[in-house]
Amino acid sequence: MRDASLRDFTAESESASAEAASDDASAGAMAPLPGCAPMSSQLRAARNAPANSQASAAARTPASSQLCIRLASADDADGIRAVYAPFVDTPVTFEEEVPSREAYRERIVRICEKYPCLVAEEGGRIVGFAYAHELRERIAFQWNAELSVYLAPAAQGRGAGSRLYTALLEILRLTGIKAVYGVVTSPNPASERLHHSFGFALMGVQPHAGFTCGAWHDVAWYVREIAPFEDAPAPPALFPAYASAHPDQVSEVIARANESLHL
């Protein structure tokens, strides 16, 4: 990918987001966004929070009756789990049992200690989420991240998935991640369209990657470079630390996601 400015990258992501959700967009002025107000104050407050609670302090916004994207925290684990649970009965995820509430909360805590996790919320109920997580554990892989996105039926076809992905990609780029990966059970036409619309390239297909739901399933690997590869790259920042140090930038990304969601 070319060495684009944040503005260039944002324009590219928003263009892809509009393409992925063109049927969801409507003309006219942006509607007010109750509950989706700028989060600069919450993010600034996170500066003085302990490291394991910075993301939580940065995440909270009042509940909204409109579809709204915001940062997640461990307190959202039950709502995120409710969206995720139905997918366990499908080949979309290779997990075959729904994790307990305690185990799933621990999972969200671990994710939020390093990476951004976003939720789509409507009327105080979580209807979708997206997050980044470690691709491989060896230190030399630290500039890569794997992405996941899940939507409840109530949020599907409304542009929530593409807006979650747009915001997630922008935040990851800000923290210093260079390449992102989508690992998709094949076939999955909706996810395949989403990744193609965001400029991901099909890196390869892993045949018979897993046996679940009574059958063998292939897995398609998608990749997108989101930042240049310098000869001496700085290590990527942990998201809570970045959000604490740069609250306005993170707040701006979330605000843009909500503005585009309600155009």
Summary of predicted features, one role per range:
Residues 172-184:
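Conserved GNAT acetyl-CoA-binding A-motif
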Residues 131-134, 181-184, 196, 201-218, ...:
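Conserved catalytic-core motifs of GNAT/GCN5-like acyltransferases
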Residues 157-170, 193-197:
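Conserved acetyl-CoA-binding loop-helix of GNAT-fold acetyltransferases
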Residues 41-44, 48, 96-154, 165-166, ...:
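Acetyl-CoA-dependent GNAT
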Residues 156, 182-192:
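Conserved beta-strand-loop-alpha-helix junction that forms the acyl-donor binding cleft
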Residues 82-98:
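Helix-loop element at the rim of GNAT/NAT acetyltransferase active sites that forms part
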Residues 36, 208-263:
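C-terminal "cap" of GNAT-fold acetyltransferases
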Residues 68-80:
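A short beta-loop-alpha structural element at the N-terminal edge
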